[in-house]
Amino acid sequence: MTRDARAGRRSLLAGAGAVTLALALAACSSPGSSDSGSSGGGSSGGGGLPDTIKIMDINGLTGPVAFAGSNAAKGTALAVEQIEADGLLGDTKLEIDSKDAAADPQQAASFASQAIADPSYAAILGPSASAQSAAVSPIVQQAGVPTVYVQSGSEGVVVGDFTYRLTPPAASYYDIVGDYIDDQSIKTASVLFNAGNPTLAQLGQDTVPALLDEKGVETVGTGSVEVTAQDFTTSASQIAGAKPDAAFLLLTGPQYPVAIGQLKQAGFTGKIVGFSAMGAGNLTSAGQTAAGAVWPTNFTADQTDESSKTFVEAYEKKYDGEVPNNYAAEAYDRMWFLARGIAEADSADRAAIKDGLKAIADKGFDGAQGHVTFEDGDARVPGVLVEWDGTKEILVEGGS
């Protein structure tokens, strides 16, 4: 599929048009004034904003989502530092109150309830695990507390005008794999997906089969595994036996090294196409065994958008050369999105921030993930195609 054809399919997502980072910041630096609300901070620091705006960050810093949570915390910290230095909110300071909910939905909901009951909190940075977010969203929506998520790809997260998600659904940019299918002359494919993960199940049952059908690729086998599976020998043998040109593996990050290794051991020599969970260092243990695997993603440190390059440079400077991953990029964009909404509202009042976020979502903005637009509270980005070269992920030329 050509870039123009993809653009046509996405025309409904691009209504706001491109907004450069500098212009977006300038627009948000001088929002129209409004009456200050009672929530979110103390005495006024000028205009409609208080001296301090308090935000609860419900994160997973321990447990199975700690890898995502710790990287998200770094992206958030960088964004806060830049927002305050930029003067987007004048002299107002952002106070981020971090709460570790690990992977416990009940704990996440409890923290959200605390923020709801305490008017000093202006907004919430929601958890990244879908089960936690689905537990939080109904109560924050009913209470009217602006809450912005990353990850959390399941249904029941973006449930109304107080909830947003800055991780675009994988299905919304998976079509960029179409050009790779054409370039590699892929005519047959097998599909293996994690049936216990809603996002992966959707990709495996709907998105990928539809793309293969559109490209005229014959699906010679489809299989599924459980959410915690770590033995793929049966599936690998079946895929290798069918000898497809490509195997589409839609799995969780920790599953990929094992699945790819067992697939290669079974004699498979075709192309391997995956999902963004292949990134963020998850193929490091597979090394050269996984070389050549490709996947579409919402962010890679090598993408060419100016706003992405600016983020990567700032992140590496702050964290001693560490290369940012998608978790950090999404959290960075989330914090900037919330800050822009607050600036637009010129108020720490929860309802005013909700209206400010809508105004920013309607316009879109340039961030770490490139140009970000929204559809019904869900972020959309063009996406990029990346490849594992055996030691690191690299941008596939023309893969956007």
List each model region and its residues.
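C-terminal motif of bacterial Sec signal peptides marking the signal peptidase cleavage site
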Residues: 23-27
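Segments of small-molecule ligand-sensing domains
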Residues: 319-325, 339-393
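Extracytoplasmic "Venus flytrap"
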Residues: 42-77, 97-106, 128-129, 192-203, ...
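Extracellular/periplasmic periplasmic-binding protein-like sensory domains
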Residues: 262-332, 393-395, 399
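Extracellular/periplasmic bilobed ligand-binding domains
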Residues: 205-296
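An alpha-beta-alpha
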Residues: 163-224, 246
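Beta-alpha junction/loop-to-helix N-cap segments that form part of ligand/metal-binding clefts
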Residues: 36-39, 43, 67-72, 87-156, ...
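Bacterial signal peptide processing site
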Residues: 29-32
